[in-house]
Regions:
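Active-site acidic/histidine proton-transfer and metal-coordination neighborhood
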Residues: 19-25, 60-68, 76-177, 184
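Short, conserved active-site loops that position catalytic residues or coordinate cofactors/metal ions
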Residues: 30-41, 68-74
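Conserved beta-strand positions
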Residues: 10-12, 35-37, 113, 147, ...
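Glycine-rich, proline-tolerant flexible connector loops at the mouths of alpha/beta enzymes
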Residues: 36-60, 115-122
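A short, Lys/Arg-enriched amphipathic alpha-helix followed by its capping loop at the start of a domain
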Residues: 3-8, 26-32
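Boundary/entry segment of secreted carbohydrate-active catalytic domains
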Residues: 2-19
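A short alpha/beta connector and helix-capping loop motif
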Residues: 186-193
Length: 193
């Protein structure tokens, strides 16, 4: 069923305001060899003439692999939040096609899925069905699909996210665990056992 994956990656939000070369430097100085980036960051670099191969090579030259793309918010049939600014919604409106194009070009092995939709707007079965479809699409690109629980959205707790991953039973279906989200959600630590 599920395989345990324990990895630590520099999260894009820790270096979000730095230029790309400084993101790489901060990642390395913090002792990480992997980092996540937002699709919008990559698209911005592409608009300046850089290719995915250029970006990947520049990271590798600094001893860093971009192993995670974060977030894919458009994976579910309902995805627009009722509590986020329009600017964030637009910045994270990357389609699954575009998201996985970037993942493949950079060699990303993980994708973070956020359930940005309002709590209660989708049933467990609908969420699980959409998650399965996304896992299948991710598998075509060699990407693990890590469902992240975020307290202010549609999957606010570890338990809810785990139930989706467990019920989907996909070989590349995993959880993305964020300690801040765990504490804020008041999730039960026993769920991790």
């Amino acid at each position: 069923m599920m395989k345990p994956v324990n990895s630590f990656t520099m999260n894009y939000s820790n270096v979000v305001n730095l230029p790309f070369v400084e993101k790489l430097r901060a990642t390395r100085l913090a002792g990480y060899s992997t980092m996540s980036l937002m699709p919008a960051d990559i698209q911005g670099m592409e608009q300046t003439g850089r290719t995915l191969a250029d970006i990947r090579s520049e990271a590798a030259d600094q001893g860093v692999q971009i192993n995670r793309m974060d977030p894919l918010n458009t994976w579910s049939r309902r995805w627009v939040s009722d509590n986020m600014p329009d600017a964030y919604t637009l910045k994270t409106a990357t389609t699954a096609y575009e998201f996985f194009r970037i993942c493949e070009g950079l060699g990303c092995t993980h994708a973070s899925l956020n359930a940005m939709f309002p709590l209660g707007s989708m049933s467990h079965d609908e969420i699980t069905e959409d998650y399965i479809a996304t896992c299948k699409l991710g598998a075509e690109h060699g990407v693990n699909i890590d469902l992240e629980f975020v307290p202010l959205w549609g999957l606010p707790s570890l338990e809810m996210a785990w139930n989706v991953v467990r019920d989907a039973d996909q070989h590349n279906g995993l959880l993305c665990y964020d300690i801040w989200h765990h504490v804020r959600s008041k999730s039960d630590i026993e769920t991790l056992r």
